């Protein structure tokens, strides 16, 4: 069989269009298809799948071929526990150089005083953040007060007493239904809730916005050690100067989780008091989502946390992933370009266009609109559960995710809303005109879903009905859009057999 690479090289021969990234990508697929056919075919099928849907899950995006290629190499074979130039293993000088460059790039991009690029995910970054705060603000002062040098010097009885004491310190963060994340401690099954006494704050049910006066009142009453700000499903911006003042007034550390909007900070969309870096003590993020990097985490912090972050291993990590750190460095460098800044601004413009067209179609949005990359549609008035809406949109080629809303009576599994985002479609090059078309398609589908009832007359958790005429029209309109804005256009799907 003629290889993908052979076909590609023949096609571009003499056209001056050769892409080294495409050559490398196709060579890798060729090898896998030949040597490990089932794995190679699954990768090809995933590419086809991603090219056949409008990806509107707010936490997803498309990384560049450069980012992907940086992960596929022998760096994965190297153990490098520790921090740059201070490892628990020998022969790490090349990994040191890569990680150091990644750290310095992160600090320059965000204007941060210190950075740790080792976390494998956003959840790991959040765990490192809370462990760093506990170590810095609770554990170390307690050990010193007891007259010991390190926690390892404590006798067993005093160590157990200190552990019990640490779990009583308070953490105040956004609840899950108000747009917070599982790792913000307000969900008891998550490990974060077991490290501290975690308390929630909620959005105002009338405005669906965070009320800083209410947050300040709760903080003053409970005097938490940590105040968490950030979101995974909240469509407005936050004022970090105000949140910093609330934290200072109650003696709390301000930790900001900017996993969803890090790309908007890097791209210069969130500036001034909307940029958390100058105000927060610790900032965490993923490196995918709006940053368009590999799946991974990143922690940025004030200088006083630098030593603790450099001890991520053994604090809560073992060996980092040097191949992913290399890809993070590539993504962070891409985020420093003018093109990325244009991209970040277009992400928000596209979200606002979606919101405007949805509202013209009579759909209700939480908070009445959006100031960032996402929006949440309240489906209550349509009588359509979020899970059914998710399924029906998936069936016509639009990927979204069901999402709970404040005081959601339907629970976390069924939900009363759906969350949508524009990062991935913007990466494909779509603009406001395309967003109008997308919004009109979605609105028409949502308004024509019939909910199938069970024998007792209650709404089904998994089934909805959409007429074939509406479904076919939606699929064709989606296909037309995807045909004009293909994912990785340099990769010819016709050769992927």
Swiss-Prot record:
Location(s) in or outside the cell: Cytoplasm
Cystine residue pairs: none
Pfam families: SHMT
Residues engaged in binding (6S)-5,6,7,8-tetrahydrofolate: 176, 180-182
Catalysed conversion reaction: (6R)-5,10-methylene-5,6,7,8-tetrahydrofolate + glycine + H2O = (6S)-5,6,7,8-tetrahydrofolate + L-serine
Keyword Ribonucleoprotein in record: no
Pathway(s) the chain acts in: One-carbon metabolism; tetrahydrofolate interconversion; Amino-acid biosynthesis; glycine biosynthesis; glycine from L-serine: step 1/1
Modification N6-(pyridoxal phosphate)lysine, positions: 289
Keyword Calcium: no
EC annotation from Swiss-Prot or TrEMBL: 2.1.2.1
Cofactor(s) required for function per UniProt: pyridoxal 5'-phosphate
GO CC, alphabetical: cytosol
GO molecular-function terms, A-Z: glycine hydroxymethyltransferase activity; pyridoxal phosphate binding
Annotated site residue numbers, Plays an important role in substrate specificity: 288
Enzyme class at the top of the EC tree: transferase
Family: Belongs to the SHMT family.
Subunit relationships: Homodimer.
Function (record text): Catalyzes the reversible interconversion of serine and glycine with tetrahydrofolate (THF) serving as the one-carbon carrier. This reaction serves as the major source of one-carbon groups required for the biosynthesis of purines, thymidylate, methionine, and other important biomolecules. Also exhibits THF-independent aldolase activity toward beta-hydroxyamino acids, producing glycine and aldehydes, via a retro-aldol mechanism.
PANTHER family linked: SERINE HYDROXYMETHYLTRANSFERASE, SERINE HYDROXYMETHYLTRANSFERASE 1
Protein name (Swiss-Prot/TrEMBL): Serine hydroxymethyltransferase
Annotated organism of origin: Chlamydia muridarum (strain MoPn / Nigg)
